[in-house]
C-alpha cells in the first residue's frame, strides 16, 4: 500500500469539505485568520480537551481544575508586565507599506539564527546587514526601524470609555490561576505539591497569524500551573516533560514526529530557570511548538503578592516554614495540538483491487478517543432503517454515533474513513430476518474496522463493549 506525502492544503480541504473547520464569517468575506469549528470539528476539539482533562485532572493525583474569567482586573496585566512589555517586533516595508514581524523575516531566511535571543536593536542591525531579507510582498529590502507592537486586545467595562474603564482580553490563562492560588489552596486543603489546570480562550493581536489554526488571534489554551517547594522544581520540571510527551504518544503521535528542544540561556525569560518546548513536525514547517514547559520559579506569585498586598505564601506544616511556591507550567495550545492530531492522522492510501484497478482512500487514523463519531450505523437497505435506528439510538446513550443510509455501502465506508470514524456497523437482512424468504433473524451485525478495513460479525448485544474496548 502506497501513501501520498501530506500537505497542509490537503488537511485544510478535508476540514472545510467535511465540517471540521470553516472560515470565520465566510458569507461576509471572512475575517483574516478566523476559523469556526463545524459539527465534526467541535466534537473533535471537545474530545481533545476531554482527553487532556482526563489525563491532567482525573488521572493525576496532584491536580484540580479551574475556570477563571476572561476579563480580569486590569491591574493583573500591569503587575505581570503585559501592559508595558507584551509586544512583537513590528516593522514596515517602505516600498509597499506592508507590515511584518521582524523575527519572522529573519527566521524564515536564516533559520540557523536564534532570533528569540536577539534584542530589537540586534534584529534591526541583522536585517540591515543582510540584503537577502526582503519584503515577502514586494521583494524590496527597505524597512523602517523596529517598534514595539502590544499584542493585547483592549476593551472597556461599563457605559463610559475612559482610562478608568480600560480592560483587556486575557492574552494567557495562567494569571487566572495565580490570582486564585490562595483560594484554591484554602478550599481544597491541598498540600504541596499540587497543580491547577484550566482550559480556556486567550487573545493575542498577532501581527502575522497564519498556517490555518496553528497561529490565530483567538485561541484556546490548556494550561497547568504546578506549585512545588523551592529546590524540588527541577525534579518536577523533568516529571512534567515526560508526562506531557507520553500523553501525546498515547493518542497516536509518532515519537519521530516529536522533539524536545531546551531553550538556550539567552532565550529564557528573565524569571525562568528552565524551559523546554515539545515541537511537532508539521507539514508546513520543519518544527512547530506544541507545548511549552517552563520553570517559572516564584516570579508570578511574588509579583501578585507585592502588587495586591495579599499573602500568597504557603505554610509548610512539615518544616514549619512560610514560603512562596515555585511553579512548573506545562502550557499547550488546544487548537495547535488539534491540528497536530489531524496532520498525524491524515493519510491518502493508494489501493489496488482484485481486478488491478487503482484507487485512493482518504482516511483519518484518529485515536478513537479523539474521533468525532465512535461508530456509524449503516443499513444495507432503507427497508432496514427501523432496526438500524434502534441500534443507533441505543449506542448514542454512551458515545457519538453517525447514521448514514444514502449511497452504496462502499461509498458510505469511504465517507466515514475520511472523517475518522473508527467503526462502521452494517445492518443487513440477516440481522432482522425475513419470514417470507425463510431467513431467521440472527441479531448480528457486521463491524468494519477503519484502519484495517477488516470485518467481523458479532451480536448486537456486544457492540458497546467492543467499541469501547
Q: Where are the language model's segments positioned?
A:
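NTP/phosphate- and nucleic-acid-binding module
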Residues: 1-469
Amino acid at each position: 500500500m502506497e501513501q501520498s506525502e501530506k500537505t497542509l492544503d490537503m488537511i485544510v480541504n478535508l476540514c472545510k469539505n467535511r465540517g471540521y473547520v470553516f472560515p470565520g464569517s465566510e458569507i461576509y468575506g471572512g475575517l483574516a485568520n478566523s476559523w469556526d469549528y463545524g459539527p465534526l470539528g467541535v466534537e473533535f476539539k471537545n474530545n481533545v480537551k476531554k482527553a487532556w482533562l482526563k489525563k491532567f485532572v482525573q488521572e493525576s493525583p496532584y491536580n484540580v481544575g479551574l475556570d477563571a474569567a476572561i476579563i480580569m482586573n486590569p491591574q493583573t496585566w500591569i503587575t505581570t508586565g503585559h501592559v508595558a512589555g507584551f509586544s512583537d517586533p513590528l516593522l514596515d516595508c517602505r516600498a509597499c507599506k506592508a507590515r511584518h514581524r521582524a523575527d519572522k523575516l529573519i527566521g524564515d531566511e536564516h533559520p540557523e539564527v536564534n532570533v528569540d535571543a536577539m534584542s530589537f536593536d540586534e534584529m534591526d542591525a541583522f536585517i540591515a546587514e543582510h540584503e537577502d531579507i526582503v519584503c515577502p510582498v514586494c521583494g524590496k529590502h527597505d524597512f523602517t526601524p523596529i517598534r514595539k507592537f502590544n499584542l493585547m486586545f483592549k476593551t472597556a467595562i461599563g457605559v463610559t470609555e475612559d482610562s478608568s474603564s480600560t480592560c483587556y482580553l486575557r492574552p494567557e490563562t495562567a494569571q487566572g490561576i495565580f490570582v486564585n492560588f490562595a483560594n484554591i489552596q484554602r478550599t481544597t486543603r491541598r498540600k504541596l505539591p499540587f497543580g491547577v489546570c484550566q482550559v480556556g480562550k486567550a487573545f493575542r493581536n498577532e501581527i502575522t497569524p497564519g498556517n490555518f489554526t496553528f497561529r490565530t488571534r483567538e485561541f484556546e489554551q490548556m494550561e497547568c500551573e504546578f506549585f512545588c517547594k523551592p529546590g524540588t522544581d527541577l525534579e518536577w520540571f523533568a516529571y512534567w516533560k515526560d508526562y506531557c510527551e507520553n500523553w501525546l504518544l498515547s493518542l497516536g503521535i509518532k515519537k519521530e514526529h516529536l522533539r524536545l528542544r531546551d531553550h538556550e540561556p539567552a532565550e529564557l525569560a528573565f524569571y525562568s530557570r528552565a524551559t523546554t518546548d515539545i515541537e511537532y513536525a508539521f507539514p508546513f514547517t520543519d518544527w512547530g511548538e506544541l507545548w511549552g514547559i517552563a520553570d517559572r520559579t516564584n516570579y508570578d506569585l511574588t509579583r501578585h503578592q507585592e502588587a495586591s498586598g495579599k499573602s500568597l505564601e504557603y505554610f509548610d506544616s512539615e518544616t514549619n516554614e512560610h514560603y512562596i511556591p515555585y511553579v512548573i507550567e506545562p502550557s499547550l495550545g488546544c487548537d495547535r495540538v488539534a491540528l497536530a492530531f489531524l496532520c498525524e492522522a491524515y493519510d491518502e492510501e493508494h489501493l489496488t483491487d482484485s481486478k488491478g484497478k487503482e484507487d485512493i482512500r482518504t482516511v483519518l487514523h484518529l485515536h478513537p478517543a479523539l474521533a468525532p463519531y465512535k461508530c456509524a450505523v449503516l443499513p444495507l437497505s432503507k427497508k432496514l432503517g427501523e432496526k438500524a435506528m434502534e441500534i443507533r439510538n441505543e449506542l448514542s446513550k454512551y458515545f457519538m454515533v453517525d447514521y448514514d443510509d444514502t449511497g452504496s455501502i462502499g461509498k458510505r465506508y469511504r465517507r466515514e474513513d475520511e472523517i475518522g470514524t473508527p467503526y462502521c456497523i452494517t445492518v443487513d437482512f440477516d440481522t432482522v430476518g425475513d419470514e417470507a424468504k425463510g431467513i431467521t433473524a440472527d441479531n448480528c451485525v457486521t463491524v468494519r474496522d477503519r484502519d484495517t478495513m477488516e470485518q467481523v460479525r458479532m451480536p448486537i448485544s456486544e457492540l458497546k463493549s467492543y467499541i469501547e474496548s
